[in-house]
UniProtKB/Swiss-Prot annotation:
NCBIfam families: PRK13262.1. This is Urease accessory protein UreE. InterPro entries: UreE (IPR012406), UreE_N (IPR004029), UreE_N_sf (IPR036118). Keywords: Chaperone, Cytoplasm, Nickel, Nickel insertion. It comes from Yersinia mollaretii.
């Protein structure tokens, strides 16, 4: 096993390493969302190198990090992180609103995101939400709930990761693929039993069973026979 205790550089951000590895062969260490949050793990590269990652606890691997460099054979071990895309909601424009408007908008946005069971992290006047459904569906949720005045965009998760602390990264990416998927897109003018769009994924419960459901009524569920956990 090859022990990796330090990151040499980043081929995507560091011009020196970009030039050095211009004609090099990349032996990729491919990490998924959960693995990317760990400062310690053991995994093989695409060319079969047995790598033991043992970094300082505050260090998080980033896409393009160079972990090893065999100059003689012109081969570099480089990290490739496969993260979900992220919706970035810019809250900066709320600074110009009245305190009442700011509080109301933030409360309603939090309620809308929570109603979809979407994970979120707020940082630098932005809200980061990992994609669990199609971007068109997330776009519809934002616009239907009246947040079209808040600029939002979709970016690669790897662009957001360096800005996050370990705990924030775990919250945003750790197990995002296991989140229950709820999409409710209703017009404010819809009747209680109107034709608004409802998409529900399967819910897993602690008692080992699961169920799926779709309906044309409001999102107000009562289950008397068991707790409804997410």
């Amino acid at each position: 096993m090859i022990l990796i205790e330090h990151i040499l550089g980043n081929v995507k951000k560091d011009p020196v390493w970009q030039a050095k590895l211009k004609d090099a062969t990349f032996d990729l260490l491919i990490l998924d969302q959960r693995e990317a949050q760990k400062s310690r793990c053991r995994k093989s590269s695409t060319q079969g190198l047995d790598l033991g990652i043992s970094l300082d606890r505050h260090v998080v691997l980033a896409d393009g990090d160079v972990l090893a460099w065999d100059e003689e054979n012109n081969v570099a071990v480089v990290v490739q992180i496969n993260l979900r895309d992220v919706m970035v909601i810019d809250l900066s424009e709320l600074k110009s609103r009245s305190p009442d408007e700011l509080i109301k908008t933030c409360f309603e946005l939090g309620h809308a995101l929570g109603n979809q069971h979407w994970k979120a992290v707020t940082k630098h006047n932005e809200v980061y939400v990992p994609l669990t459904v199609a971007t068109s569906m997330m776009d519809s949720v934002m616009r239907t709930h009246g947040f079209q005045h808040l600029p939002f965009r979709f970016v690669k998760g790897a662009e957001i990761l360096p800005q996050l602390s370990n705990s924030e990264a775990r919250l945003l990416f750790g197990g995002a693929e296991d989140s229950d998927t709820h999409v409710h897109v209703d017009s404010p003018l819809d009747e209680p039993h109107g034709s608004g769009l409802h998409v529900h994924a399967i819910h897993s419960h602690g008692d080992g069973h699961s169920h799926s459901h779709s309906h044309d009524h409001d999102h107000d569920h009562r289950h008397d026979d068991h707790d409804h956990k997410h």
